[in-house]
């Protein structure tokens, strides 16, 4: 290996072992990730692309959140309602990302 290649290899971060490895694994293997975002919603989808700021392009996303209906004074507390919606493609800005997990249910990879 030439000297220039050695220097280039040293400067390049290793995404296979670092904190972005879950995102890299999702891109390479087409696996789902669960992303907790700042608006108290969860995104379950497949990562198509990402950068070091955790900006992401996601596909086949299920957005999940809980709403508590408002009640009149003196009435019982309303039960929380789980809601979700499907988003085929989206761009997620990295500053809203709190946590990224491999899909806890382990859904199989989806063919393109």
Curated annotation (Swiss-Prot):
- Keyword set includes Transport: no
Q: Where is the composition biased (Basic and acidic residues)?
A: 1-15
Fetch the Pfam families from UniProt.
LSM
Q: Which cysteines are joined by disulfide bonds?
A: none
Q: Which InterPro entries match?
A: LSM_dom_sf, Sm, Sm_D2, Sm_dom_euk/arc
Q: Where in the cell is it found?
A: Nucleus; Cytoplasm, Cytosol
Sequence ranges assigned to domain Sm in this UniProt record:
20-106
Superkingdom of this entry's organism?
Answer: Eukaryota
**An example Gene Ontology biological process:** mRNA splicing, via spliceosome
Keyword flag DNA damage: no
Q: Name one GO molecular function term.
A: RNA binding
Q: Which UniProt keywords apply?
A: Cytoplasm, mRNA processing, mRNA splicing, Nucleus, Ribonucleoprotein, Spliceosome
- Residue ranges, annotated region (Disordered): 1-23
Question: Which SUPFAM superfamilies does the entry link to?
Answer: Sm-like ribonucleoproteins (SSF50182)
Q: List the Gene3D superfamilies.
A: 2.30.30.100
- List GO terms (cellular component aspect): catalytic step 2 spliceosome; cytosol; pICln-Sm protein complex; precatalytic spliceosome; small nuclear ribonucleoprotein complex; U1 snRNP; U2 snRNP; U4 snRNP
Q: Which residues form a coiled coil?
A: none
Q: Which family does it belong to?
A: Belongs to the snRNP core protein family.
Query: Any idea what job this protein has?
Result: Plays a role in pre-mRNA splicing as a core component of the spliceosomal U1, U2, U4 and U5 small nuclear ribonucleoproteins (snRNPs), the building blocks of the spliceosome.
Q: What is this protein called?
A: Probable small nuclear ribonucleoprotein Sm D2
């Amino acid at each position: 290996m030439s000297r220039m290649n050695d220097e280039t290899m040293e400067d390049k971060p290793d995404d296979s072992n670092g904190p972005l490895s879950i995102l890299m694994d999702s891109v390479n293997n087409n696996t789902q990730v669960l992303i907790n975002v700042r608006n108290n919603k969860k995104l379950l989808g497949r990562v198509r692309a990402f950068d070091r700021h955790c900006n992401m392009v996601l596909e086949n996303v299920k957005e999940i959140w809980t709403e508590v209906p408002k009640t009149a004074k003196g009435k019982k507390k309303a039960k929380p309602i789980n809601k979700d919606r499907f988003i085929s493609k989206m761009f997620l800005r990295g500053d809203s990302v709190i946590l990224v997990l491999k899909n806890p249910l382990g859904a199989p990879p989806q063919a393109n």
